[in-house]
Design a protein with these regions (language model features):
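Extreme N-terminal starter segment of soluble prokaryotic enzymes
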Residues: 1-2
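Residue-level detector of beta-propeller blades
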Residues: 67, 143-146
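C-terminal "cap" of GNAT-fold acetyltransferases
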Residues: 84, 119-122, 126-130, 138, ...
Length: 169
């Protein structure tokens, strides 16, 4: 059974190991890191020192086979505790296709709504990242129709804004 626990600095080794290409890296973090590849120390430094770091909750998904995934939950607006945003969502690439991504996102939704009291959860996903988009929609998110363009390595990628509300449950 998949579970969530607080992220540990040592988890960065696993998270970074799942990022095999720059394309996957950019799907995962967009432009949050300037250079690829990054090290576990780079990830932990970002988590410790980025603006608003105290308002971000990092989680590791695990099961009987070990660490399976990673997800962050943050308050995008300090004045709105009813809305949280997911980010840095990634699954162990060797364990994809088993429903673990959807299970992890659903656990994070449950935590967000039942523990944090959020009424709305948002996430951005690149349209080009079709497996992630399918996962989020299957977990209960819906497309808001809002699209933001990113320039990634000379290509224009469309970031779709998705949301989940308690009414969607």
């Amino acid at each position: 059974m998949l579970r969530l626990r607080p992220y540990r600095r040592s988890d960065a080794v696993n998270v970074i190991s799942w990022i095999k290409t720059e394309r996957i890296f950019r799907f995962w973090c967009a432009d949050r890191f300037e250079n690829y590849p990054i090290t576990p120390d780079d990830l932990n430094d970002q988590y410790d020192n980025s603006e608003g770091a105290e308002d971000v909750f990092h989680f590791t998904a695990y099961d009987e086979q070990g660490i399976a995934g990673h997800i962050n939950i943050r308050f995008p607006d300090k004045n709105d505790i009813d809305t949280v945003r997911f980010g840095y969502v990634i699954l162990d690439d060797s364990r994809r296709g088993q429903g673990l991504g959807k299970a992890m996102v659903r656990l994070a939704l449950k935590y967000s709504t039942e523990i944090m009291g959020a009424e709305k959860v948002t996430i951005g996903v690149f349209a080009e990242n079709e497996p992630a988009l399918r996962c989020y929609l299957a977990a209960g998110f819906r497309d808001t129709g809002v699209v933001e363009e990113y320039s990634i390595n000379g290509e224009v990628w469309n970031c779709l804004e998705l949301e989940y509300t308690c009414q969607d449950a």
